[in-house]
Amino acid sequence: MVANGYGRTAWLVWGVGVFGYALAVMHRAALGVAGLEAAEHFGTTPGIISTFVVLQLATYALAQVPVGLLLDRYGSRLMLTGGTLVIAGGQALLATADDLSTAYVARVLLGIGDACMFNSVLRLLPRWFAPNRVPVLSQVTGMVGALGQIAAVGAVLPLIKLLGWQTGLLITVAFSVFAAVLVLAWVRDAPPGQAPAVVVDPIREIPRRIKGVSMHPATQLGFWVHFTSGFSSIAFVFMWGIPYLVVGQGLSQAEAGGLFALLSVASMVAGPVVGSLTARHPLRRSTLVL
């Protein structure tokens, strides 16, 4: 039971939000596991398919500031709903695309929708849970999101191989549409009786605020930690993944899928441990990073 008394409602709000986020991760990782099938469908090479992911991640990064401004203005509920529907639209376009240019547009849409998800879920935590639970739940949110990578191996790839590229992907799109309905029905930006936190900055103030945030030591530390520690796993999961293990290393698809899932399981185990240590020793976060 949470200390603030919101109990099951808080867990429901968070659970629905993190379900949508996990599906976003599943779609994000889909080409990392189905790169060979994508290359066959579009009549190209896995190297070209990896450029889809580069474009997607670049879009994801560039969308962070505008998405953050929209999140401040409209709240998590609308951003999660909109992000999930944009992801579904992008994946539906990818499923029905026959040429590379349309596929690139589809991945741009996925990057935009994906950018709406994680921060929107995190924004719910301090409104619904006691402060001492937020660090652990932030890690658990990322941990549950890693289930999306496992779902990409265990669901997306088998569906594509069994039913074909278009039908397999469209089935995964249906899950995201269902998630959007759940978010709209159950997620609320604040508990009953509390006004949602709305921040509306004048447009002219935005560059100054971005500069101020960018110059803050905590922001710079977080940036360089993610920059140096995350690139290898991101490159593997979202760009090379199973095609590299199958074609480059000669593993069977089952062996490659097992190794792919192992990376996600390892992060799921480590996440809550790091979150708990961060909550207990907030002034030792830099030591934990090192």
Predicted region positions:
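Extracytoplasmic gate region of multi-pass secondary transporters
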Residues: L31-G32, P217-A261, M268-G271
